[in-house]
C-alpha cells in the first residue's frame, strides 16, 4: 500500500479462486475489499481488472486500484502528473478526446507551477467547458504569435510595453524600490543601467552624460593592473558582486578609444578584456560599424540580462537588439526615420498629425508658415484641416 498522505492511494487485491458465476459480482468484491481496507468505496477510483481461470473453471480476480483523495492535494508534491491524468479520465468521462487532452494540459500547467490551490479548484469545478475554450484560445494565440515575423514581434513588444507603462502611470504608479542592483560602486552608472531595463527603453534611449569602459582583468594580474590604472590617474569603480571586473570613468572631453589605445598592450596580451564601452555614439561618428554594433549589443544585453557574455537561448533578444542598433546606424543615430516637429528637415515618414497640429497652432496665432521648411504640406495634400468652426479671423498663410 502506498503512503496514505498521497493524493492517489494505490491498492492491490487478489481474491481466492471462486466459482465462475462470481464473474458477474466482481464489483461487489472490489467494493468489499475497499471497505475492509478503509479506503472508502465512494471515492473516485481507477481500477485495472485481471481475471485468472484455472483448469477446473474457477476464477480469481486481481484488482489494481488507484483511489483519489482530493482533500489531500494541498501541495503538488503529493501528486504526480500521471495521477492527475487518471483522475481526469475517471471524473470526466463525458469529455471528448480533444477536451480531455486540453483539460489535462491545464491541470499539468498548474501542477508544474506548484499552484495546488488553483489545481484543486479546477478539479472540483462542476463544468469546465469555458475553461477548455479559454485554454484552446491561449494555445491558438500563442501558436499564432510564434509565426509572426521578427519585425512584428518587435512591434508587439514595443507597443505592449508602451500600453502597460501608460496604464501603470495612470492607475498603478510603481513606488517600489528598484529590485535590480548590479553592485557597481558608482551610483550614476547604476541609475543608467536601471533606466535601460526593457527593449522599449533601449529604443527611447538618450545619450548619457557620463561615459564608461567596462573591463575584465585576468585574476593573476588583478592587483598589478588596478595599481597601474590608478597610477595613470584613471577613475575606477568596482563591482561588489563580480570579481575581477571594473569600470573606467571616461573624462568628459575624451572618448573610450583614447583609453583603449593606452591599454592596447594589455588588450593584445589578453591581460584585460573589453566587455563594453557606453559611448557608442563616438563609433557611429567615426564610422566604425562593426565595433559600434558589437559594442552596443554587449552593453544592451548586459543592461537587460545582467550578463557579460551572450547565451544561445537569448537568440531572439539578440536579434531584436541587432535590429534596433542597425536601424540607429542607418538612420544616423535615430531609430525613427523622421525628425522631430521643430526640425527644419522633414521626412515623408513623419506623422501627418504632427503637421496638422502645427497648422492648428499657427492658425491660432495668425502666423505665416514656411511650407517647405516647416510643414511640408505636400504630404498631407487632400486632407481637410479643421482650424475652427465659423471663425473667419483664424487663418493660416502658406508661403
Curated annotation (Swiss-Prot):
It comes from the Viruses. It is found in: Host nucleus. GO terms for biological process: regulation of viral transcription. InterPro entries: Baculo_p47. GO terms for cellular component: host cell nucleus. Keywords: Host nucleus, Transcription, Transcription regulation. It is involved in regulating viral transcription at late times postinfection. Belongs to the baculoviridae p47 family. This is Viral transcription regulator p47. It comes from Orgyia pseudotsugata multicapsid polyhedrosis virus. The lineage of its organism: Viruses, Viruses incertae sedis, Naldaviricetes, Lefavirales, Baculoviridae.
Amino acid at each position: 500500500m502506498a503512503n496514505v498522505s498521497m493524493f492517489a492511494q494505490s491498492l492491490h487485491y487478489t481474491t481466492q479462486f471462486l466459482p465462475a458465476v462470481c464473474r458477474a459480482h466482481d464489483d461487489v468484491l472490489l467494493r468489499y475489499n475497499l471497505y475492509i481496507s478503509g479506503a472508502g468505496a465512494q471515492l473516485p477510483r481507477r481500477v485495472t481488472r485481471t481475471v485468472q481461470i484455472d483448469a477446473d473453471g474457477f476464477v480469481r480476480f486481481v484488482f489494481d486500484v488507484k483511489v483519489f483523495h482530493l482533500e489531500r492535494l494541498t501541495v503538488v508534491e503529493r501528486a504526480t502528473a500521471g495521477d492527475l491524468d487518471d483522475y481526469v479520465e475517471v471524473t470526466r468521462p463525458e469529455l471528448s478526446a480533444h477536451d480531455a487532452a486540453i483539460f489535462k494540459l491545464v491541470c499539468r500547467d498548474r501542477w508544474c507551477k506548484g499552484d495546488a490551490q488553483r489545481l484543486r479548484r479546477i478539479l472540483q469545478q462542476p463544468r469546465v467547458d469555458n475553461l477548455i475554450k479559454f485554454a484552446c484560445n491561449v494555445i491558438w494565440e500563442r501558436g499564432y504569435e510564434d509565426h509572426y515575423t521578427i519585425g512584428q514581434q518587435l512591434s508587439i513588444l514595443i507597443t505592449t510595453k508602451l500600453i502597460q507603462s501608460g496604464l501603470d502611470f495612470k492607475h498603478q504608479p510603481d513606488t517600489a524600490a528598484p529590485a535590480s542592483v548590479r553592485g557597481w560602486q558608482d551610483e550614476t552608472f547604476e541609475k543608467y543601467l536601471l533606466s535601460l531595463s526593457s527593449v522599449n527603453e533601449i529604443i527611447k534611449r538618450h545619450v548619457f552624460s557620463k561615459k564608461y569602459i567596462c573591463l575584465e582583468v585576468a585574476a593573476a594580474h588583478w592587483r598589478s593592473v588596478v595599481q597601474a590604472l590608478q597610477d595613470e590617474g584613471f577613475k575606477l569603480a568596482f563591482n561588489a558582486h563580480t570579481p575581477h571586473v571594473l569600470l573606467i570613468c571616461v573624462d568628459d572631453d575624451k572618448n573610450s578609444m583614447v583609453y583603449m589605445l593606452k591599454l592596447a598592450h594589455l588588450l593584445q596580451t589578453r591581460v584585460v578584456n573589453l566587455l563594453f564601452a557606453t559611448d557608442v555614439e563616438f563609433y557611429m561618428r567615426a564610422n566604425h560599424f562593426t565595433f559600434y554594433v558589437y559594442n552596443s549589443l554587449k552593453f544592451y544585453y548586459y543592461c537587460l540580462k545582467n550578463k557579460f557574455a551572450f547565451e544561445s537561448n537569448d537568440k531572439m533578444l539578440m536579434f531584436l537588439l541587432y535590429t534596433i542598433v542597425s536601424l540607429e546606424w542607418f538612420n544616423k543615430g535615430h531609430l525613427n526615420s523622421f525628425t522631430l516637429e521643430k526640425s527644419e528637415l522633414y521626412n515623408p515618414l513623419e506623422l501627418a498629425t504632427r503637421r496638422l497640429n502645427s497648422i492648428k497652432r499657427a492658425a491660432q496665432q495668425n502666423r505665416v508658415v514656411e511650407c517647405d521648411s516647416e510643414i511640408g504640406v505636400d504630404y498631407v495634400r487632400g486632407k481637410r484641416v479643421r482650424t475652427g468652426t465659423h471663425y473667419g479671423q483664424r487663418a493660416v498663410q502658406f508661403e
